From Swiss-Prot:
Enzyme Commission (EC) number: 2.2.1.7
Catalytic activity, reaction form: D-glyceraldehyde 3-phosphate + pyruvate + H(+) = 1-deoxy-D-xylulose 5-phosphate + CO2
Pathway per the UniProt entry: Metabolic intermediate biosynthesis; 1-deoxy-D-xylulose 5-phosphate biosynthesis; 1-deoxy-D-xylulose 5-phosphate from D-glyceraldehyde 3-phosphate and pyruvate: step 1/1
Gene that this polypeptide is encoded by: dxs
Sequence intervals crossing the membrane: none
Root EC class: transferase
Protein name: 1-deoxy-D-xylulose-5-phosphate synthase
One Pfam family recorded for the sequence: DXP_synthase_N
Organism classification: Bacteria, Bacillati, Bacillota, Bacilli, Bacillales
Keywords assigned by UniProt, alphabetized: Isoprene biosynthesis, Magnesium, Metal-binding, Thiamine biosynthesis, Thiamine pyrophosphate, Transferase
Amino acid sequence: MTKIDHPRVVKNMSIPELKRLSAEIRRFLIEKLSKTGGHIGPNLGVVELTIALHREFDSPKDKLIWDVGHQSYVHKILTGRAAAFDTLRQYKGLSGFPKRSESEHDVWETGHSSTSLSAAMGMAIARDLKGTDEYIVPIIGDGALTGGMALEALNHIGHEKTDMIVILNDNEMSIAPNVGALHNILGRLRTAGKYQWVKDELELLLKRIPAVGGKLAATAERLKDSLKYLLVSGVFFEELGFTYLGPVDGHDFEDLFENLRYAKKMKGPVLVHVITKKGKGYSPAENDKVGTWHGTGPYKIETGAFVKTKEAGPSWSALVSETVRRLARTDPRIVAITPAMPVGSKLEGFASEFPDRMFDVGIAEQHATTLAAGLATQGMKPFLAIYSTFLQRAYDQVVHDVCRQNLNVFFAIDRAGLVGADGETHQGVFDIAFLRHVPNLVLMMPKDENEGQHMVYTAIRYDDGPIAMRFPRGNGLGVPLDEELKEIPIGTWEVLRDGCDAAILTFGTTISMALKAADELAKDGISVKVVNARFLKPMDVAMLHELLESRLPILTVEEAVLQGGFGSAVLEFAHDHGYHGAVIERMGIPDRFIEHGSVSELLNEIGLTSTHIIDRIKTMVPRKQKRA
């Protein structure tokens, strides 16, 4: 593997040699990812397809554009990056997604789904305007194809007759099993046999029908249309303006080469429908029916058992979903919605117990949000489980459809804050800034899982408009959980530790580092008040006035972007209420995208640890003698 420095090496290999290479790549991926973790299922499924693409096209002249990008590991191996796989998704190591700064062969950066077709069309138009002749080849999965943006692009590409070759990698799964009518169309295609062969035979048959006289000609045309729709599901893509080729066996080199070569000869947009097996070559991943092996942490190769880390408390995702499930037993209004993340959001239990009240809408965040809004207009209590990074995709729906109408939707914002190895495309650090200025919305974050379950209860009980609870990736702190759930008064903070020299206002994951900093500062005679600012909107106005009137230096700390964040809200409050002499400083995520690495490494890099808090407080508080 490490000897491959350019994809040209596969161009002169025989098919037996390519089969041996495929097996070697699979062994390499299984071994490396058992240590680093990563997206093993998608990559094991595209080994032959990726080799075939690099054999038939000339990267980087020809543009290979990977939708989502989590299936680009084989592409990285073939473009000379195998030696870096020990650092995959590690701090300062190889990215788990295509990265333009990493290789000239990575022409488009991804992480979110359904963007490849629009980007490819832009590249194709630029090619035509410049008069060059490279092939533009987006590779998109059947799950990503359900995204509205992909369908918009298909419509535009077909209308413009843009020259490009779309590879549809159909493995019947995105992360979890795919849903929806388009998935059903593709299912019919998988069993329809060779579309082009059927189409050619059909056209020969139709040519034999004598078109004599208006009535007979009309009959022949109706027959043509009827046969076309009866025999060929590929008409979906043909009606959009694409030439459809397939289905193609994505693990058969001869089938792949034949269809890719044919596609290269054609004008206009071509769609090559390739059938692959997610997880192929490693039985635990190959037999995965729910998406567990889509992306994993380290695992034991021999057994497929995941290497468990010592976690103190329950999974945050499980805590939230199971609390909602508990409440749904006595509240028939509760309906759960997820945009293709039932496993990640730990909604399997809810789906099993309440199948008629659980909706996996596929990769369709905009639809998921407005679906929730529609449910709310009819008195239901929609619970939308969505990752912070994916909520970005539904911003207009949050503003226009939910908050503007002041509808009772509960947004459970998972993976809020830094998420680590998935890197800059998945860090959940923007939601406070893009939500706190939207009217009618309540925004909160708990300090631990016990407060978290009470916040879920508060959100379900809240009937005065939309409410959002953000919570981090991973597990809780292991604190005891109260048996009885209780409502937390909206817009209230709590003092966790009193102090007379300075105050730290923080929430969520950064509370523990603030408390640790306060302990250390106390040893130096500096008394620091620590406030759990659990409601980011509305803020605790009474406590803010009290703090500002006390003239204590205030430090806000947040694991989110500083621009437009919680600290900005505190500064605005102080300014608007005339506290112009207040000493307020902020700590948080700087104005740049944060790359991959462990959360602790990233926090240290950006200066957001208890040590950094201690140093900042010492600059804000006059020197004091250490107390006896």
